[in-house]
């Protein structure tokens, strides 16, 4: 049986929201984790291997980093009430933070720098299948 945190009855080492978070923030955190799990499952079903989840840098966070053959995809996961709302939630400012975080990840993993790189988004909404937008944005200025 997997080891659990006795205080929360969750798997040991699972990310936890801040202790002072409001109920709304806790709900958003859990929704995000669920959306990221659905997105990772979709990528795995499509033949990707997940290299990293929730990769954090001072520049920003990348929800998922996945590889399929000679391609590395940096994936932003957005969960909203509708897929259209999720699509509009990936702002230019956020795109730049993801690009900066991807550069930091590549510095730490130089063996992946020569592969094809792509910035994807996976949109998640209730009662809908997740939508994978390949090349949702690029690093070009």
From Swiss-Prot:
> Where is the segment annotated Disordered?
1-24
| GO MF terms, alphabetically ordered | nucleic acid binding
Say which domain of life the source belongs to. Answer: Bacteria
Which Pfam families does UniProt cross-reference here?
UPF0102 (PF02021)
Q: Where is the composition biased (Low complexity)?
A: 10-19
- The protein here is known as UPF0102 protein BRADO0179
The record's section on PANTHER family has: UPF0102 PROTEIN YRAN
Family annotation (InterPro entries): Restrct_endonuc-II-like, tRNA_endonuc-like_dom_sf, UPF0102_YraN-like
- Similarity comment text for this entry: Belongs to the UPF0102 family.
Listed NCBIfam families: PRK12497.1-5, YraN family protein
Lineage here is: Bacteria, Pseudomonadati, Pseudomonadota, Alphaproteobacteria, Hyphomicrobiales
User: HAMAP family under this entry?
Assistant: UPF0102
């Amino acid at each position: 049986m997997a080891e659990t945190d006795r205080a929360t009855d969750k798997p040991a080492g699972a990310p936890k929201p801040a202790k002072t978070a409001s109920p709304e923030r806790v709900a958003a955190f859990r929704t995000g984790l669920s959306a990221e799990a659905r997105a990772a499952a979709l990528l795995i079903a499509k033949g990707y291997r997940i290299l990293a989840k929730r990769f954090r840098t001072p520049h920003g966070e990348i929800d998922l980093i996945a590889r399929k053959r000679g391609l590395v995809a940096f994936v932003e996961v957005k969960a909203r009430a509708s897929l259209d709302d999720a699509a509009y939630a990936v702002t230019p400012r956020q795109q730049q933070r993801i690009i900066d975080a991807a550069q930091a990840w590549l510095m730490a993993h130089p063996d992946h720098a020569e592969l094809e790189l792509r910035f994807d988004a996976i949109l998640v909404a209730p009662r809908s299948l997740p939508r994978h937008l390949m090349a949702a944005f690029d690093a070009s200025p």
